[in-house]
Protein backbone atom coordinates (compact mmCIF):
# COMPACT_ATOMS: atom_id res chain seq x y z
CA UNK A 1 0.00 0.00 0.00
CA UNK A 2 1.00 3.61 -0.41
CA UNK A 3 2.03 5.68 2.67
CA UNK A 4 -1.32 7.48 2.42
CA UNK A 5 -3.23 4.20 2.00
CA UNK A 6 -2.47 3.04 5.54
CA UNK A 7 -4.41 6.06 6.82
CA UNK A 8 -7.44 4.83 4.89
CA UNK A 9 -7.18 1.45 6.61
CA UNK A 10 -7.41 3.19 9.98
From Swiss-Prot:
GO annotations of cellular component type? extracellular region
Q: Which residue ranges run through the membrane?
A: none
Q: Mostly located where?
A: secreted
Q: Which InterPro entries match?
A: Tachy_Neuro_lke_CS (IPR013055)
Methionine amide: residues bearing it: 10
Give the source's domain of life in one word.
Eukaryota
Q: Name one GO biological process term.
A: neuropeptide signaling pathway
- Subcellular localization: Secreted
Q: Which UniProt keywords apply?
A: Amidation, Neuropeptide, Secreted
Its annotated function is as follows: Tachykinins are active peptides which excite neurons, evoke behavioral responses, are potent vasodilators and secretagogues, and contract (directly or indirectly) many smooth muscles.
Concerning its family, UniProt says: Belongs to the tachykinin family.
Official protein name in the record: Ranatachykinin-C
Query: Which source organism does the UniProt entry give?
Result: Aquarana catesbeiana
